[in-house]
């Protein structure tokens, strides 16, 4: 156990956390797309991240499926999430052993818009992971936060990486 979890704090997620979470989400039939720092990393750009960011379809049924999957985390922090929270708030932060941010919309793009706008499925350790395409990630970075500056400056790198 690392120092953060010894103090009851969340630790930075690692790739195996992402794989485990996506395995659980898939088992529950949850509709989600990986966005944010891990998505950027999977496209080949170096980026640190403190959370796993998921764009989720915001229906009550799907949020319940997401919560069941998040219930595999040790502190069961997802039990505190109401079914309508993803529709009511910009970001729903589930701070368990790791932090998972749930978004119903990202820069005006909801789950259906993401599916239409470009999602690819990557297999990680045998687990299919729906991942925002490079183009979709750039569209989602239309708003600039301080921690996004390296990604925003590197947005042209996505264009150069296109197949």
PLM regions and their residue ranges:
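Compositionally biased terminal segments of proteins
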Residues: 1-163
